[in-house]
Amino acid sequence: MEGDRISQVRAELTRLFDEQVEFFRRRAQRQPTPAELREYQERRERIRQLFAELRGLREAA
């Protein structure tokens, strides 16, 4: 079951990284709105949480 969770975490990380890249592409063209900055920060925090979870899963394996 841990393998399933690792796959889920990886998929979510991929999606979040894609969204972060898109944020930086848009930012190169214009200033982000306060809502876009907040979403960026929320994604960044979620990425940190997911990496911590992955570390825990790998240590438990």
Regions found by a protein language model. Name each.
Residues M1-T14:
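Short, charge/polar-rich alpha-helical segments
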Residues A11, R15, V21-A60:
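Short, charge-rich amphipathic interface segments used for partner binding and complex assembly
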